[in-house]
């Protein structure tokens, strides 16, 4: 039977954990109380901290055997993530916590599939939640007061959280329409291209467009790793620029890793590889003073990538795509890679583009499965929607 997992540190938040579990059970839902504390529980639980700790690669003692609380919290987070991945009876998960508890519980939530309901009631929910949510779909709910015993406000907050998670578990989202899903990456400067492609494919595919802001690429690749995508049209690979050159919207070192691991059909291009993103002009690192910039808006400053930087970017992309055994088709628009990189545009630079294109062609190691095609077009030309035909071709393959 699928159950709602109610998770918290039963050594310090036992009263709140019991109240939340009882409120959910009162709706008729099956509940499992899960303890992720690092000391003795103060309430009965269904799954003990000792059980969770046993999932740590270093064994239970790696979590519970020391006296360093910070190390124990970090180790419990690792163990809980592995525990969550091992279960097949989770209908939904709800957690409560302060700083340590939020870190532990969300580690496990991030390991769960996208779409499975997750609510974290936390004292940290009104602050910077990016480290806890990352690219998952965790709902962060402020506890308002600290969790140091129940009071009239915390009872209301926990009651509302209980009703929310019970409702999500009882009425899951309807199944999709059966069309396979594909991921596409887009930036403002590649919008005409990606919009045209998505419009052409919607009758056959469920098109999920991701804003290439660092988190967008990670979200898309998480879906790929989760088996929720049937292919990727990665027109906008700009996040690599920020990774290599210190921009504010970077990819991670694992960019393209999901494509290599899954072997999904992949069409890629060089969208917005002419730019690195920074915030307001005053935030641009001193080493870049004197470079060519474009003020996208008062809070976003774009820097044109140089020929040497384009070589490094192209080699980084090509080397990683060379690890992909699935069908790969990389398209190069010879007349420009963004709305700014067009003849007469602020970032138009034939030399830098030529170096970029050569580096990708040289390092991607074309073979029967990996192809590179140059097109005498700008990336936003309507004809560049030949990427659609390329995707359909490799998807059939």
Swiss-Prot record:
Similarity-based family: Belongs to the UPF0261 family.
Name the record gives this protein: UPF0261 protein mlr3387
Pfam hit, one: UPF0261
Taxonomic classification: Bacteria, Pseudomonadati, Pseudomonadota, Alphaproteobacteria, Hyphomicrobiales
């Amino acid at each position: 039977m699928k159950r709602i997992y109610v998770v918290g540190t039963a050594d310090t938040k036992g009263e709140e954990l019991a109240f939340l579990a009882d409120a959910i059970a009162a709706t008729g839902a099956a509940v499992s109380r899960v303890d992720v504390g690092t000391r003795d529980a103060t309430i009965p639980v269904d799954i003990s901290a000792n059980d969770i700790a046993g999932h740590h690669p270093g064994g239970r003692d790696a979590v519970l055997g020391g006296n360093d609380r910070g190390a124990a919290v970090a180790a419990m987070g690792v163990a809980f993530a592995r525990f969550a991945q091992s279960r097949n009876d989770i209908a939904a998960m709800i957690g409560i916590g302060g700083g340590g508890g939020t870190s532990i519980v969300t580690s496990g939530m991030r390991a769960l599939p996208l779409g499975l309901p997750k609510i974290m009631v936390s004292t940290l929910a009104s602050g910077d939640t990016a480290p806890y949510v990352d690219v998952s779909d965790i709902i962060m709910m402020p506890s308002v007061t600290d969790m140091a015993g129940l009071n009239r406000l915390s009872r209301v907050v926990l009651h509302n959280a209980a009703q929310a998670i019970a409702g999500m578990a009882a009425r899951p989202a309807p199944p999709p329409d059966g069309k396979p899903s594909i991921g596409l990456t887009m930036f403002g400067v590649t919008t005409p291209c990606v919009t045209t492609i998505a419009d052409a494919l919607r009758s056959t595919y469920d098109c999920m467009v991701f804003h290439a802001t660092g988190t967008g690429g990670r979200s898309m690749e998480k879906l790929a790793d989760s088996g929720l995508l049937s292919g990727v049209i990665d027109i906008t690979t700009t996040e690599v620029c920020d990774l290599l050159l210190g921009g504010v919207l970077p990819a991670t070192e694992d960019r393209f890793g999901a494509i290599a691991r899954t072997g999904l059909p992949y069409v890629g291009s060089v969208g917005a590889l002419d730019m690195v993103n920074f915030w307001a002009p005053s935030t641009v690192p001193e080493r870049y003073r004197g470079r060519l910039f474009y003020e996208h808006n008062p809070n976003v400053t774009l820097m044109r990538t140089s020929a040497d930087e384009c070589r490094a970017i192209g080699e980084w992309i090509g080397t990683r795509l060379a690890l992909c055994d699935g069908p790969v088709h990389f398209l190069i628009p010879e007349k420009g890679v963004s709305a700014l990189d067009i003849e007469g545009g602020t970032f138009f630079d034939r030399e830098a583009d030529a170096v970029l294109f050569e580096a990708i062609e040289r390092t991607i190691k074309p073979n029967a499965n990996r192809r590179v095609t140059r097109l005498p077009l700008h990336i936003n030309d309507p004809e560049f929607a030949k990427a659609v035909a390329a995707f359909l071709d490799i998807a059939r393959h």
